[in-house]
């Protein structure tokens, strides 16, 4: 009997095959006290398990093909960094020696503490990083149990007609990027998970490998049985179990069309993004580490529109990264882009994204999303902020760098930020350090107050970048982490569209460059809408770039503008839907 499950679409395409169920690592471990004379041996047992995981991750990275997206190796590096972090190394050992916990108990105790910290994070992307920590802990637990650190690869099942299947669909409560990479040479054609969101590393790897996927499919691993025949509709986040012959035929046809589309898209990699009426559009990439620059270039990005610097600051127990460490990371991205511009956002962290090294400063925040975060926190820590500013300025000596400041809302915040940048320049002058004295400084527009103060921002800042994810959240008063109201998170809400359009149009009139760097920029269904508002600079995940470029190549901006005006004037849902249909490409 066919039935359908609904989840979150994270990677487009259609996958057809038999279900291969992955059992999660057991986190319900035994708890017992270790004898005093066995404490050293228990610590060594934990260290040996971590060493086994480290060796497996290194082997996976070593075996990556030369043409693999660079971000895949970067994700393995992230797991290796988490593995060696004191939170999973020294602190569990302290629990073994101090409380006589067995290794599994010590490890899961620390995991529970970390999970509570990450649950307080408002930002969806950073909140999803707790999944990476859990996945690393699961690997260590497997090693402690003597099980293989990497899950066994699936084997081909039989199709309905008895012939060998074209692939299998991995179904799991969750699946780590490293496991996905292990499957790359097998018949693994897609995956379905109970957990996850659009910004999880698993979802990002799926997009990088162009593997159809649906995540957040509640109870999928319980409702789907081993060897069930299933279809993933990655565009809709739909999973069809035991489909009829008619449904199978329909989706096989979609697969064929998708294969042709992929070939056409690849031919666009080196095609300039120019509209039918001759307007050049800049397509840039969002990255989180220097290693991601390769994927940006491979997709045809003309620069980095958002380098999230906060990842240098995460998972540190005792101290924040120093100036030289930050400089090397920023310069790495600049060098990797070979003269193309790199926009680096200053640390966007705080009460809703607590750092391990400063976590106690934020424990009393009653509403962390509205608390001491982003530029508010940077200005409250001028010593830390000056260190980052000096590192950013030094990197600007090696290529075009733009500095982007998050969550600005007050004139005083702008003035304080610019004053500290000037102070950082004076400090570098005193040291004889090189930097670009004309480095551009821009503002994130992600709070409604910033839109209402646009004349001030346009007078004092060199460029603007609209962070649509936070702008939607703050405009609609929606907590994206709360499933009870998540359905109200609507990028097409008339109020949101009014704010985005106003920002773009006023910036254009003032001659100030403006970009969109949130999820709206990478959604091809939004491309024509944003073009009609006047947007000429998009920044997105590299995997989204070619589909957005395809929309741009078929767009005529002058003709889109009156259609977009109709969308902006439609406040009734039915009227808006009709206006959007008029806007859609025929």
UniProtKB/Swiss-Prot annotation:
Binding-site list for phosphoenolpyruvate: 308, 345, 469-470, 480
UniProt cofactor(s): Mg(2+)
GO cellular component: cytoplasm
GO molecular function, one term: phosphoenolpyruvate-protein phosphotransferase activity
Location of this chain's protein in the cell: Cytoplasm
InterPro entries xref list: PEP-util_enz_mobile_dom, PEP-utilizing_PTS_enzyme, PEP_util_AS, PEP_util_C, PEP_util_CS, Phosphohistidine_dom_sf, PTS_EI, PTS_EI-like
EC number: 2.7.3.9
Residue sites binding Mg(2+) per the record: 446, 470
Cystine pairs: none
Active site annotation, chain numbering: 201 (tele-phosphohistidine intermediate), 517 (proton donor)
Catalytic activity: L-histidyl-[protein] + phosphoenolpyruvate = N(pros)-phospho-L-histidyl-[protein] + pyruvate
Keyword Metal-binding listed: yes
An example Gene Ontology biological process: phosphoenolpyruvate-dependent sugar phosphotransferase system
Group of enzyme by EC: transferase
Gene3D superfamilies membership: Phosphoenolpyruvate-binding domains (3.20.20.60), Phosphohistidine domain (3.50.30.10), PtsI, HPr-binding domain (1.10.274.10)
Subunit structure: Homodimer.
NCBIfam families noted in UniProt: PTS_I_fam
Note: The reaction takes place in three steps, mediated by a phosphocarrier histidine residue located on the surface of the central domain. The two first partial reactions are catalyzed at an active site located on the N-terminal domain, and the third partial reaction is catalyzed at an active site located on the C-terminal domain. For catalytic turnover, the central domain swivels from the concave surface of the N-terminal domain to that of the C-terminal domain.
Domain comment, as recorded: The N-terminal domain contains the HPr binding site, the central domain the pyrophosphate/phosphate carrier histidine, and the C-terminal domain the pyruvate binding site.
Purpose: General (non sugar-specific) component of the phosphoenolpyruvate-dependent sugar phosphotransferase system (sugar PTS). This major carbohydrate active-transport system catalyzes the phosphorylation of incoming sugar substrates concomitantly with their translocation across the cell membrane. Enzyme I transfers the phosphoryl group from phosphoenolpyruvate (PEP) to the phosphoryl carrier protein (HPr).
Protein name as catalogued: Phosphoenolpyruvate-protein phosphotransferase
Name of the encoding gene: phbI
